[in-house]
Curated annotation (Swiss-Prot):
Annotated GO CC locations: extracellular region
Gene Ontology MF terms: toxin activity
Listed InterPro entries: PSMbeta
Domain of life: Bacteria
Sequence similarity: Belongs to the staphylococcal hemolytic protein family.
Keyword S-adenosyl-L-methionine: no
Its job: Has hemolytic activity and also inhibits the growth of gonococci.
Protein name: Antibacterial protein 1
UniProt keyword list: Antibiotic, Antimicrobial, Cytolysis, Formylation, Hemolysis, Secreted, Toxin, Virulence
GO biological process: one example: defense response to bacterium
């Protein structure tokens, strides 16, 4: 869950800095960590 929060914070920070490459990478991290969290919740 902490990694998901860190990825969201990184995406927000990148958006504020207009660093689009880092923002794209952070969004991928959000999706990846979100899937991991859902997998743990549903037992995948």
């Amino acid at each position: 869950m902490q990694k998901l929060a860190e990825a969201i914070a990184a995406a927000v920070s990148a958006g504020q800095d207009k660093d689009w490459g880092k923002m794209g990478t952070s969004i991928v991290g959000i999706v990846e960590n979100g899937i991991t969290v859902l997998g743990k919740i549903f037992g995948f």
